[in-house]
Amino acid sequence: MANSPAAPAPTTTTGGDSRRRLSASIEAICKRRFRRNSKGGGRSDMVKPFNIINFSTQDKNSSCCCFTKFQIVKLLLFILLSATLFTIIYSPEAYHHSLSHSSSRWIWRRQDPRYFSDLDINWDDVTKTLENIEEGRTIGVLNFDSNEIQRWREVSKSKDNGDEEKVVVLNLDYADKNVTWDALYPEWIDEEQETEVPVCPNIPNIKVPTRRLDLIVVKLPCRKEGNWSRDVGRLHLQLAAATVAASAKGFFRGHVFFVSRCFPIPNLFRCKDLVSRRGDVWLYKPNLDTLRDKLQLPVGSCELSLPLGIQDRPSLGNPKREAYATILHSAHVYVCGAIAAAQSIRQSGSTRDLVILVDDNISGYHRSGLEAAGWQIRTIQRIRNPKAEKDAYNEWNYSKFRLWQLTDYDKIIFIDADLLILRNIDFLFSMPEISATGNNGTLFNSGVMVIEPCNCTFQLLMEHINEIESYNGGDQGYLNEVFTWWHRIPKHMNFLKHFWIGDEDDAKRKKTELFGAEPPVLYVLHYLGMKPWLCYRDYDCNFNSDIFVEFATDIAHRKWWMVHDAMPQELHQFCYLRSKQKAQLEYDRRQAEAANYADGHWKIRVKDPRFKICIDKLCNWKSMLRHWGESNWTDYESFVPTPPAITVDRRSSLPGHNL
């Protein structure tokens, strides 16, 4: 129980062992003496089990063995009773409150290390932070020891000279030891409920006091040397604090006060609700409606936050303040993918704004194509990943943090530029930050995620950029370290084009059927591996690579090209292939032929019209194969002239913004 330091387990000793050590004859003497006193109505103290004072009044004719039998039992009971009273008198405040203010059971156990914080509180910071509160000072305290609770009493009295007790000790039972982070965030759950109904582990609810609290104060554990953001005790305490705060009646909004080295859960206690921070002290005044909605969510990804079958619920927000967004940084090869993604969103029936973040490396020509597809251009300054090597693929992917600066929107559905929206997903705007599908382990996939733009969240991400380690070196890993309390949406809303090594034939068949289903069953199809527009349309070129073959499927490949063909003709040019890419495709095909890959895709004759279209100065791509891999000179932009921007109808577009 939080607020419940160690208490020794009582050991009850009976007289059974003593009786076994007595001889039968002595036992008989004692029994006869006991019956004689009972019949004679003599000294009644002989049969009173708790009469442990007047030893001298015992019958002097009794055998010493009788004294041994009964008086030792009495002595042991006296010791037990004394120990119990001592424990009650000197126990932590949590027990006194439990005994006097609730029917909670006594909990004889050591403090759970998951809830323990060794932080020395800076009471000067506490006092100065409390100056931001004008309301009364009835304080609910959680997870403090008895000395700290006494200090809270002193703090409350320093502002109020009344005699009324201003501190209420809150009780919270610990979560069971088997409630681990992996149990709360399993890698897989049976979303379709084919064999079982996913159920989250039970976490004890806090008992909400009947008395109104102006301030809820909580001491949070933070083990900086470990995986502090994935801590069951830390999560449990914050959910308990949110529960008490959300229980306020009427229009009253209390404050929540954390003492912790580490920042609270940013999508539970939002930085926009942060009133003050001093050192390890955090004071919030949360929006209670928002808090109540979030408390209706499952405690982890162990259950779907948006069950299958109820995806048609409308968003309650303002559609003009909701948008789809993606980002391109230094990667013109994804322009075609972003254009196709925009086309798929419009085909799904959504009319929400489309916002794309680009940096200065995206040319005016490519910007014109994006605008023609419906994207509103926002120019950004790139953010370098400080842990990435120069020119590495992940060098600039922290630029994704700029999404939180889109504060002219309340909700953003971020989508990667390599996916298609097959069915309308506007209902996801009703979901909180961060809502996403599972990836591996306890992590979410950031390819589709709901976020709530806020400048202070952006600042939070930037403040820890040198401190937080990304598991994969990229933005997805970083965001998973910050937003550990994420909410699972069905995998059909970000279905990966991928056949796992462990997939059996039946699983592969089901996936293939999903890829090609008409009308679509999947909401979003996410193209991993070599992208469709970088292959010829004749077949999925992932088949020609032993590295990428797990991403190969002609069915999903054709699905993408159907969307491409529905795009305005003027946008097709943004999907043309450079000569170097044609050389790469031929190189992979020859490798597959040499290895005699059984699928036989390397035998298919290419009929894609783009095969004969040259957009650079290196049209003889076959000559490149003679020197393949020798140098990188074919990447020079001088070999790829930039065409003039196409004409765009801007009547339906908003002015661009810079971030």
Curated annotation (Swiss-Prot):
The chain crosses the membrane at residues 70-90. Keywords: Cell wall biogenesis/degradation, Glycosyltransferase, Golgi apparatus, Manganese, Membrane, Metal-binding, Signal-anchor, Transferase, Transmembrane, Transmembrane helix. Residues 1-14 have a biased composition (Low complexity). Disruption phenotype: No visible phenotype under normal growth conditions, but mutant plants show reduced xylan substitution. It holds the Pfam family Glyco_transf_8. Its cofactor is Mn(2+). Mn(2+) binds at D416, D418, H526. It is a single-pass type II membrane protein. GO terms for cellular component: Golgi apparatus; Golgi membrane. Its EC number is 2.4.1.-. GO terms for biological process: cell wall organization; glucuronoxylan biosynthetic process; plant-type secondary cell wall biogenesis; xylan biosynthetic process. Belongs to the glycosyltransferase 8 family. Glycogenin subfamily. This is UDP-glucuronate:xylan alpha-glucuronosyltransferase 1. It comes from Arabidopsis thaliana.
